[in-house]
Amino acid sequence: RASAQAARGKVRLAAIEMVHGSAGSTAFGIKKNMWAPAAVGRDFDLSPSSLLPLEPYREHITIISNTDVRNAEAFTAPEIGGDHFRSSAVFLTQCHPKQTQGSDVNVGTSIDQFYAQKFGQDTAIPSMQLCIENVDQAGGCAYGYSCVYTDTISWSAPTQPLPMIRDPRVAFDQL
């Protein structure tokens, strides 16, 4: 009960990446506003959308949608075709990743980590990264890019990807 009281009033940020053909990122999903309200501003409408369960909290949330990952596009000829392998790293950094299959990765600090640095000091866990897919790929993925770019959206520094938790029990135990 004391921890619930302490958490009340704290500012939080949740960043959800939808890639690789999820319904909300297709032309159909965008037209149906599956993950983005049709109207912008304080009068946004959460129905009918996947966001409807957030309706009781609408006065406390801000939804940023329809962002792009243009920096995942190829800048040079050898990068052509690697957009998918760069997009997750670009999502919150908006930086173009260094093409490498080694440990010398470099992309940029992600916005969630800037947020955690500013608002997270007053919380027991300033930042937590969760995922629903396996992230245990090793080595290079394709097009000369390290798998860490595909597997990571949060970066504490340009060369420091943050590991994600897939197991709900591990996340619960940390909380």
Positions of the model-derived regions?
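Ligand-binding pockets and gating/stacking loops
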Residues: R1-L175
